[in-house]
């Protein structure tokens, strides 16, 4: 069995539920409104449009969130942690590798303006989904690629898009996709200072970078 001390040194190893930090019962305090969309409540309620939710992990959530809030049809974004064991973790706890969580962006979108398939195309093309427990220079389980689906339809579309993107990656000489695709677990929202971080700090770090490979146009639309 891998020991806790080994995970602290090698953050590419997922902890077990028994090894994970205990966390806490209290969620992080969040601002009421989205920093970019101003009058839009960060977590709703959302009264206009055909609202749906998507959850993506593609490396550091600062840069990922910015790319999604820039997309027409997205009405709100929130960053957080998901896929692990520790309830309501702090950023420092996630960075330790002892929570099992990956950094994610919860994307709130209007299906009449942008489809889930279009968001999936963005997801695949914005990062390198073949790198396992890392994304570029960001190394550890918290940077693993993930799609967490809020419905069976999303799960089906996510897997189909993965297979299509794998075909394109293979043609370009890339390896196998390591993206975790599953039904949505609990998303624990990150601390307030992480929300819309690059809008508050325009010169801040952004580790997002794709492979240059694109999905075929026929798979990018509705």
From Swiss-Prot:
It is an enzyme of class 1 (oxidoreductase). Its EC number is 1.8.4.11. InterPro entries: Met_Sox_Rdtase_MsrA_dom, Met_Sox_Rdtase_MsrA_sf, MsrA_MetSO_reductase. One of its GO terms (biological process) is protein modification process. It comes from the Bacteria. The active site is at 60. SUPFAM superfamilies: Peptide methionine sulfoxide reductase. Pfam families: PMSR (PF01625). One of its GO terms (cellular component) is cytoplasm. GO terms for molecular function: L-methionine-(S)-S-oxide reductase activity; peptide-methionine (S)-S-oxide reductase activity. Gene3D superfamilies: Peptide methionine sulphoxide reductase MsrA. Keywords: Oxidoreductase. It catalyses: L-methionyl-[protein] + [thioredoxin]-disulfide + H2O = L-methionyl-(S)-S-oxide-[protein] + [thioredoxin]-dithiol; [thioredoxin]-disulfide + L-methionine + H2O = L-methionine (S)-S-oxide + [thioredoxin]-dithiol. Has an important function as a repair enzyme for proteins that have been inactivated by oxidation. Catalyzes the reversible oxidation-reduction of methionine sulfoxide in proteins to methionine. Belongs to the MsrA Met sulfoxide reductase family. This is Peptide methionine sulfoxide reductase MsrA. It comes from Pseudomonas putida (strain ATCC 47054 / DSM 6125 / CFBP 8728 / NCIMB 11950 / KT2440). The lineage of its organism: Bacteria, Pseudomonadati, Pseudomonadota, Gammaproteobacteria, Pseudomonadales. The gene is msrA.
